[in-house]
From Swiss-Prot:
Disulfide bonds: none
GO molecular function: sodium:proton antiporter activity
Pfam families xrefs: PhaG_MnhG_YufB
Organism of provenance: Rickettsia prowazekii (strain Madrid E)
Protein name: UPF0091 protein RP266
Family assignment from sequence similarity: Belongs to the UPF0091 family.
InterPro entries, A to Z: PhaG_MnhG_YufB
Length: 106
């Protein structure tokens, strides 16, 4: 029963992280900072929620599957985020500072 309440607490922490990441996603000005907010949501909050659901789950096989999914997300999401950031850098997507400097110079 204690594991159930720990799982609920961990899921609440994960949901708080998701909502704060969503707020950051809408408030950040350019692609790269929005990419950072999205990767924090996917790399931190989703695995935390999955581990919380694994604590709540009574069946051991389902708990192992949830923990395995959380580990895969923790390992693979930073690679995907890096590839997306590098591709956008190679495509020369401008940052907020360069756009702001061009407005100031005019």
């Amino acid at each position: 029963m204690t594991l159930y309440y720990i799982g609920i607490l961990v899921v609440i922490i994960g949901l708080f992280s998701i909502f704060s990441g969503i707020i950051g996603f809408f408030r950040f000005p350019d692609f790269y900072t929005k990419l950072h907010a999205a990767s924090v949501i996917e790399s931190f909050a989703v695995p935390i929620c999955l581990i919380g659901f694994a604590c709540i789950e009574l069946d051991m096989l389902n708990s192992i599957k949830l923990i395995l999914a959380a580990l895969l997300i923790l390992l693979l999401n930073p690679v995907a985020t890096h590839a997306l950031g590098k591709a956008s850098l190679l495509m020369k997507i401008r940052t907020y500072n360069t756009v702001l400097l061009k407005k100031i110079r005019k």
